[in-house]
């Protein structure tokens, strides 16, 4: 099995985070909205991103993505889980989601997330027990209830 590891992101990781964001999200944004405005995406990403809130995902020692989990008193929120295309479809996302599910189960809290409706990652979340709890014009809201002990 491939070794997936996480480390805390640092401010100097911002450019890597931007690159992962574009590589992971551009195809889905183009399908959902018709185009990718690079300047607008860069601006919005920079305004909404504190690198130190993220973790860098590594596969066999090489950085391949990032995740951002926001901790609330009553839930975990998976804000971002981005993988470079070469890491997609290799079980990395599934390992990360399984780890997050175990963490939520230990804390006895649900996990909530929002995903573009057209993003195939939606199936990954469904395989891990997430259910649709709402929809917007472009996104699906999902939640996984903590497993009972």
Model-derived segments and spans:
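Conserved acetyl-CoA-binding loop-helix of GNAT-fold acetyltransferases
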Residues: 89-102, 122-127
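Conserved beta-strand in the GNAT
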Residues: 62-70, 77-82
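A short helix-loop-beta-strand connector motif used in the catalytic cores of GNAT acetyltransferases and
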Residues: 46-56, 65
